Amino acid sequence: MSDHTDSFIAHLEALQARDRGALAALRHSLAFAPGSYPRAYPYVERFAGHAAHERDARRLALYAVAGLFALHPQQAARSLGSALGELYRDGSGSIEGRFIALLGADAENIVEYLRQAISLLAAKSIGLDYGRLLDDLTQWMNSGNDPGRLRQRWARDFYRAAQPTPDTPLETA
């Protein structure tokens, strides 16, 4: 991760600690396209830096991650795929289908799928690495990139984390 990514995540964590109103505005921003909710601008725009236009992939990813963090501000050292795989392993059977649908999303609707996934993680208090998610989303939302490799990495992380651990009882038919 870059210093810019680390600074942005530290900024979100500081907002969590001291400004519930900011988190409310960022959560509400998820009802809009990334970067189009004016009340979120004071908390995100300064990090957009040299984003040349309103559809810049990094700018869109910053807004998306800010809203997702506000929805579930639990930072952890696991990727999105690993977090969802852990949720699946812990007995949430419908997660696999939702995860496959998320992998099939395009740049225009990925945030909606992520909002649903993050809500499920929040319900089970499973955190994830928002800095990594920011970098991943920047790639996903870049129209010049094919998100195929990212999809494959998320799938590998999911299925590795979904494997039963030695102390997990196996289901019987």
Residue ranges and their predicted role:
Residues F8-A173:
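Basic, alpha-helical nucleic-acid-binding regions used in initiation and control of genome expression
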